[in-house]
């Protein structure tokens, strides 16, 4: 069973698979060098980036992330404001300080980072890091960034962790999850909480989710109050702050029954604009889709009742359980299954989390999740200029409203649904595998080739 902690990770924008994962890989590589006693002998490092990681890597800051990882940084604690100056120094001097300054090595601007368009066999997002001592290659490793900030090296690809802790309710499908809920009389969040308590202490769980919600709120707040143009060739203007001013200033809007939709849009836009700017965000389950889970919880906070720790913990546990089902049985990588694995999964998770808070039965929670995904099936990932901006930012807003609608439809339904959550997860994965690679985060088709940068 995947811990819910793994579904919500504090990190850095703009991409979990192309920024967070590669930074973790770089850090893991230098940690290995230290552990093996090789670090002080290293004189040069080089990186090869493959497949989708290469094709959209520049727009997703993959190169910057790997360099920051090799320098000894982690996505959740890296000083975001210090990154540009550090990268400028590396580019200017062709030298890189590894492992928090322990050793300085050659990292030439022309071939320190090589972008290769071919795929490696195991996954669309692959990278190899090499370390030399003089002319001798002393260490080399292949990493795959499999979505949501998860990384795995070649030896462990597709293998279960051997030291997995036994949990009381080890569900691998929605049917099993519902079976345990029936057996115990527990809600989805209650049942998942019992699993988490086998992995972490109660205090750790409370502290972890307090930090997740606090990071999400801070991100919404920054996004709502920051103006200007997002980085990159598209020159996309931020929209959340102007929308906030409009909503706060206009009396006329307060009589509009659709007013709440504007607020939900604003929450989601705020988060995804921060992500696009390389800010501090929470993967939920990825960065490309990181606005949906917080926007729906912010909606609950503003329009239903103030969110307390008990409320946000229930929400994250239910949403995270659904995310874990997609992670175990399909994919949360846009490079593997298109945007249905990112925005589709986030919509499904948020719908389930909201249904849980609104008092849904375990069946209704799964129906909400199913509706949230069913109407994102076939969604392509075709980011313009390889950046997490168009169509990604606006798409998070649309999917946040869709998640709220999905949970309402699930709870108002009186007939039996024809499509189960397990079937829709299976369908999403097969649809993604059938999808032309042009539509799986390669920026070689769709909007990516129709929309011109100025």
Where are these regions (language model features)?
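Short, mixed-charge aromatic SLiMs
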Residues: 44-57, 89-97, 241, 315-328, ...
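C-terminal regulatory domains involved in ligand/effector binding and gene-expression control
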Residues: 75-253
